[in-house]
Amino acid sequence: MDDTIKKELQSAVFERLIQHLRERKDVQNLDLMNLAGFCRNCLSKWYREEAQKNGIEISDPDARKHVYGMPYNEWKKKFQK
């Protein structure tokens, strides 16, 4: 498998994970952190850091919006227990 295909597959898997977490609003970040060692906020931080490595500036709120599918404060009000 060449690197381009590998990167495309990895990107698709990441987006699928993000979509899965958007659909599973019942799963709290604290539960994810306790069980898996990462949460939605970690994913948004990693997304922002990888963008920075490529010379792309993404704000923390924009990175979180990508992961949560809505502004973070809105998600917290609606779904955080």
Name every feature range the model reports, one short phrase each.
Residues 1-81:
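Domain-level signature for proteins that mediate thiol-based redox and metal-cofactor handling
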